Amino acid sequence: MGLITTLKRWFNMIFKKQAEEDFNIQAAEFPEMESLINRCANIYRGVPEWLDDKNNIKTINFAKSVCSETARLATLAIGIQIDGSARATWLQEQIDKVYFQIRHWVEYGCAYGTVFIKPNGESLDVFTPADVMIVDYDNQEIKGIIFKDSYTVGRKYYTRLEYHRFVETTMDGVTTYPYYVSNRAYVSKSPQSIGDEIDLKQTKWADLMADTPPILKANGEKLDGPLYGVLRTPQANNVDISAPLGLPIFAEAIEELKDLDIAYSRNAKEILDSKRIVLADDRLLMPSGSPVSAMTPQAMEHRCSEMSLPDYVKNVFGQDEKEFYQEINPILNTDTRISGINALLSQLGYKIGFSNGYFVFNETSGIQTATGVEAEQQRTIQFIKDVRDKLESCLDQVIYALSVHADLYGLAPVGAYEINYDFGDITYSYETDKQTWLSYVNTGRVPFWYYLVKFEGFSEEDAKTLADEANKENKASGLFGDE
């Protein structure tokens, strides 16, 4: 792990130096954030610094679980509808292509604190902080950034640096802020080196411009935003307030993650060591009159095998007159340990943004039914809403970037578009919903056939036929009489 981390750090230094030389810029530095993000990235990948083979400390990689659960809830039944023109239809096609990647983007955003989503000409790419270099920013708004992209062909390693920035320009007393994109390509024989600069035409990025002309709106005004989207976590950055980067969602709970791994490892080791043992005298295993020479450890092991004894039976050589026999059945502290684990899970979940009791070991999670969930899970609901708001903002930026990209490369007709988002209810319970609609039927608010179609899988025709029959049979008792 140490060697890999060192190599990555070394390559990032080369990447930074090359970018600064070729684009004549000075990269912004956030050493504290870089250290924290690298630490959290290792935890998310399942290689935290507290792993210890000697003391049997392993990891259950709960950081991955909380990031995955957050992404699952945030993107639950997400709908993205873009309407209004032929441009809108094209944008909808681009989003549909990556629909099932959106959950992954949110998970990476939770793990790294920030991810960047950028059009690549054919689809959308996701970049973590390790793959970008921030050049210029104002508060939380990034004004200049360099993206690093790469691919391999045989033993050749190709890298592309893509520099995005707004440039303040004043002509004849009028100040404008055109947007520029510059691309530089490199080839190397080693993955640890960026190599020598080559022409874009010699790479798979041949369709990209080395330097775009100034990009402005048709009326000469500044673009509404950059040609990429930024997904940040909702919580404030208390590590480096000035940095335009978000915190990994578990950054405040690293100590709890460590304690959880230790608690789990101790419990698992105790279970592993809890095997029943029977200590049996050699005289109980060997027939009377057996020569002493036959009572070697190897002979006793062979004898146990012949007798088909369980492997937990261990031979001991008795020295007393009476044969020795003892059973050892270790007592597990599982209940006590699980209580401690649950306390850690509750504290960990709360610090991340979930309600107390959302994560529970060996028990039902708190968000299984809609009954009472509005009151019990308000913290979880608000946290997921915050993540969804950040996701909406990022997707707005991405769709705008796609639209500008379409203008630059003539990919779709010019036209207005409108975006509508729809998210699933994280408190939804199918059984509760079913009972609610059945009560609507019983009170005459909706027809019985509609319930059959919605919940029982009937076609509308069959459902209406069945409902009519039920209405006739139960008319005397008043059931379905109002239909």
Q: What residues fall within each predicted segment?
A:
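Generic structural signal for hydrophobic core residues of well-folded globular domains
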Residues: 14, 66, 70, 74-77, ...
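Extended, helix-rich architectural segments
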Residues: 1-154, 483
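Extended hydrophobic-aromatic, low-complexity segments
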Residues: 36-37, 43-44, 337, 357-361, ...
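Activation/maturation switch segments at domain boundaries
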Residues: 437-483
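Extended, charged amphipathic alpha-helical segments
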Residues: 209-375, 426
